[in-house]
């Protein structure tokens, strides 16, 4: 008789019984936490792609509000999507930067959009990011078939244009009266359906409107009121633009564009919405606020309506949700940094080294957070590398700055932070020194409230990423992915090459293929 068979038939010792019980117990625990590997999805390009990009939206918004979500909005999207809660923008984290990174699949060091604005030495002026400042092509410029259409809904022409520079139509942007205009259409020549839509969303309908908590009965105490003062209409316009009413108008316009333009029926069409309201609100309140949470719940309701409506059309679609960046919490007053607190010590340090007793010399040309620009006409080319280091170290000696990197790559710190900083440098735009404030510190914006975006820290860099559609498996993937991965992944679904300068990877695990 085989010894193995004999051992298998032998009466177990007491210790063996204990070990077997332990193994069974461990197996039961493992089973409770076991998540099966999803079956591979067939990669199929549906005829309609909807991409929702919140200008500002942290991953923790989904977790802290999850129990308040209705079944058909974010809760459904999370359950039916390939969900990446830790998608990171590993560079400066401004809205224009995030949009450009999503569209191109690369970072500012290649696409050139280092911030919402930067200093332009040649014109001695602040330069706002514009579509033609993109140094590389975007995913949405790569569509080889002219019959396949692209539409964008955004707050401004420039934000819509960063997705597909050069588009002469199909881009909708908000006007101060809360109505939308379309690029390429003369005044009064907008599509008839847009005129009808705008009549239902005129700003005047929201004057003195109370912003009630989601689900609160009429007459409840409002979170705020959209007060209208004829002497200062811009204040009302700002309140409206950051409200759930404006956000809902954008989400409704997405449906209207799909319906009116018959998208996804006879061609492969894409509509992208850049949702700016929560970004505007976040810059006022920071990431933790009852207003932010209520706006998230409002977006949840709008998302549920959109998904239900898309289902009812009976046509296959895919939907992507992400954000251009996250947000810091509102800091104490002592964590707000004015430009003078940076420029003055830097100027003193540079003067001590290079003025050589002369007076009236200024070595700082401009400081546009987080970029410091030096006066090259007051420094020799051989002096510049040393001047940059002196400037960075002078800023580092203040209580506000955590570290820095110069345009020629010097940094006192070697870590993953350096990768984020290097990704943010683009010659001629990012200045001589990039400064990183300490975590929680923000740019002073003219009042003892509000926050600034743009830092390299995770609270600004980390956003959710969700893909729902026939090509994607449902599941949660907790490993870090990058914002540069979005364009290559969507290109793979479309059967197109990744954008020309894309450095991200195809998220093959979203197709059920495992991490590549």
Where are the regions that the model predicts?
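Secreted, luminal/periplasmic, and some membrane-associated catalytic domains
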Residues: 85, 92, 115-136, 141, ...
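Short, structured active-site-proximal loop/turn typified by the sulfatase FGly-forming signature C/S-X-P-X-R
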Residues: 62-110, 149-153
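C-terminal segment of N-terminal export signals and the immediately downstream linker at the start
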Residues: 15-17, 36-50
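Active-site regions of oxyanion-processing enzymes, predominantly non-cytosolic
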Residues: 49, 143-154, 160-161, 247-280, ...
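Substrate-binding rim/cap in mid-to-C-terminal beta-strand-loop elements of soluble/periplasmic
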Residues: 344-388, 452-494, 508-515
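N-terminal secretory signal peptides
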Residues: 1-18, 28-32
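N-terminal export leaders
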Residues: 19-23
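Active-site His/acidic residue clusters
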Residues: 161-170, 228-238, 257, 262-299, ...
């Amino acid at each position: 008789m085989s010894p193995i068979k004999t051992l298998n038939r032998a009466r177990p010792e007491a210790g063996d019984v204990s070990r077997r019980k332990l193994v069974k117990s461990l197996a039961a625990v493992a089973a409770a936490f076991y998540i099966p590997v999803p079956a591979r999805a067939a990669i199929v390009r549906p005829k309609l792609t909807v991409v929702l990009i919140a200008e500002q939206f942290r991953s923790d918004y989904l977790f802290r509000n999850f129990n308040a979500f209705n079944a058909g909005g974010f809760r459904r999207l999370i359950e039916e999507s390939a969900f990446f809660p830790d998608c990171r923008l590993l560079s400066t984290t401004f809205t224009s930067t995030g949009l450009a990174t999503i569209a191109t699949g690369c970072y500012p060091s290649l696409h050139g959009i280092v911030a919402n604005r930067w200093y332009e030495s040649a014109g001695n002026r602040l330069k706002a990011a514009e579509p033609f400042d993109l140094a590389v092509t975007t995913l949405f410029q790569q569509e080889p078939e002219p019959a396949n259409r692209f539409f964008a809904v955004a707050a401004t022409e420039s934000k819509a244009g960063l997705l597909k520079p050069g588009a002469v139509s199909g881009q909708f942007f908000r006007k101060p009266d809360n109505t939308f205009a379309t690029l390429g259409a003369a005044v009064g020549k907008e599509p008839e359906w847009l005129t009808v839509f705008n009549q239902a969303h005129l700003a005047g309908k929201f004057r003195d409107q109370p912003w009630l908590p989601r689900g609160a009965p009429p007459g409840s105490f409002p979170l705020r009121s959209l007060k209208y003062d004829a002497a200062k209409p811009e204040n009302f316009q700002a309140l409206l633009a950051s409200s759930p009413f404006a956000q809902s108008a954008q989400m409704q316009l997405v449906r209207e564009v799909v319906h009116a333009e018959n998208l996804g029926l006879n061609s492969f069409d894409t509509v992208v919405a850049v949702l700016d309201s929560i970004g505007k609100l976040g810059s006022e309140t920071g990431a933790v606020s009852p207003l932010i949470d209520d706006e998230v719940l409002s977006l949840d309701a709008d998302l549920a309506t959109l998904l239900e409506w898309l289902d009812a059309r009976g046509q296959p679609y895919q939907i992507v949700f992400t954000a251009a960046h996250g947000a810091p919490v509102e800091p104490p007053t002592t964590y707000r940094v004015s430009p003078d607190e940076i420029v003055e010590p830097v100027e003193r340090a540079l003067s001590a080294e290079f003025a050589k007793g002369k007076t009236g010399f200024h070595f700082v040309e401009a400081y546009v957070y987080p970029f410091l620009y030096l006066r090259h006409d007051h420094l020799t080319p051989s002096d510049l590398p040393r001047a940059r280091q002196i400037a960075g170290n002078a800023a580092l000696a203040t209580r506000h700055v955590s570290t820095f990197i110069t345009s020629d790559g010097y940094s006192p710190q070697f870590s993953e932070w350096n990768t984020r900083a290097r990704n943010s440098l683009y010659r001629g735009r990012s200045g001589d020194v990039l400064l990183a404030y300490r975590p929680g510190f923000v740019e002073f914006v003219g009042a003892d409230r509000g926050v600034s975006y743009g830092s390299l820290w995770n609270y600004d860099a980390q956003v959710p990423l969700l893909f729902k559609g026939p090509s994607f498996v449902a599941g949660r993937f907790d490993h870090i992915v990058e914002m540069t991965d979005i364009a290559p992944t969507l290109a793979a679904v479309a059967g197109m090459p990744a954008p020309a300068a894309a450095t991200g990877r195809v998220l093959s695990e979203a197709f059920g293929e495992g991490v590549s």
